[in-house]
Amino acid sequence: MATAEIEEIPALLKPGQTVAGLDLGTKTIGLAVSDLGLSFAHPRPVIKRVKFTIDAQVLLKALETDKVGVIVIGLPMNMDGTAGPRVQATRAFVRTMQPLTDLPFVFWDERLSTVAVERALIGMDVSRGKRADRIDSAAAAFILQGALDRLHMMRRNDYDAG
């Protein structure tokens, strides 16, 4: 499967599967994984980028270990809503990954996610060096948590309407 919409995630998951969140950077890939109840995002160690084939192999192994059924990937839109070079790079990454996995990708608007995470880490008095180590996986968790919160809101609205 190529890409999916956020609304499709529950139907795409098999029992026991989780959802992964990715924050794609030029030097690292931030990774986070949901709990089985799709309530909480948990950061995982970042993947240091080397070259695509190695990056893909390491990422797919991590996704398999965490029994991931769907991947939510941050789409770094410009503040005005237009797609810039980073969006193109993210879409190209997904296109290149698709032949390597059957896992569906869901694009999620990640505007300001890294800024929000950096502010939170500064607020927790995390040193600059430690922030650099944690920011990409924390951003992936922020992206994934946003998607999980949206799913929760959709389920609640369906329950309230029914």
From Swiss-Prot:
Keywords: Cytoplasm, Hydrolase, Nuclease, Ribosome biogenesis. GO terms for biological process: rRNA 5'-end processing. Its EC number is 3.1.-.-. Gene3D superfamilies: YqgF/RNase H-like domain. It comes from the Bacteria. It is found in: Cytoplasm. GO terms for molecular function: nuclease activity. Pfam families: RuvX. GO terms for cellular component: cytosol. The keyword Hydrolase applies. Belongs to the YqgF nuclease family. Could be a nuclease involved in processing of the 5'-end of pre-16S rRNA. This is Putative pre-16S rRNA nuclease. It comes from Brucella ovis (strain ATCC 25840 / 63/290 / NCTC 10512). The lineage of its organism: Bacteria, Pseudomonadati, Pseudomonadota, Alphaproteobacteria, Hyphomicrobiales.
